[in-house]
Amino acid sequence: MKTTLIAAAIVALSGLAAPALAYDGTKCKAAGNCWEPKPGFPEKIAGSKYDPKHDPKELNKQADSIKQMEERNKKRVENFKKTGKFEYDVAKISAN
């Protein structure tokens, strides 16, 4: 009885583990490099009709805003070191 119960448990557990061993259909070029284009799409997107052709000015907007943010933060820190009070509004800092 005990061996039958153990055998049934082993069969049940192996049945649960089987899907993990299933082949997922990818053909990896190297370990971890398993990307494949969907059927009907080109191997390379650049230059194809699916290329989004981003405007460089639009792409640089975030970098520019980060530079401006860092400049404002630098002014806030310099003002805090001078006065000992933190002022969020940079326009008020330049007036001092």
Curated annotation (Swiss-Prot):
Positions with biased composition (Basic and acidic residues): 50-61
Keyword Disulfide bond among record annotations: yes
Spans annotated as Disordered: 45-75
Protein name: Methanol dehydrogenase [cytochrome c] subunit 2
Subunit structure: Heterotetramer composed of 2 alpha and 2 beta subunits.
Signal sequence bounds: 1-22
Family: Belongs to the methanol dehydrogenase subunit 2 family.
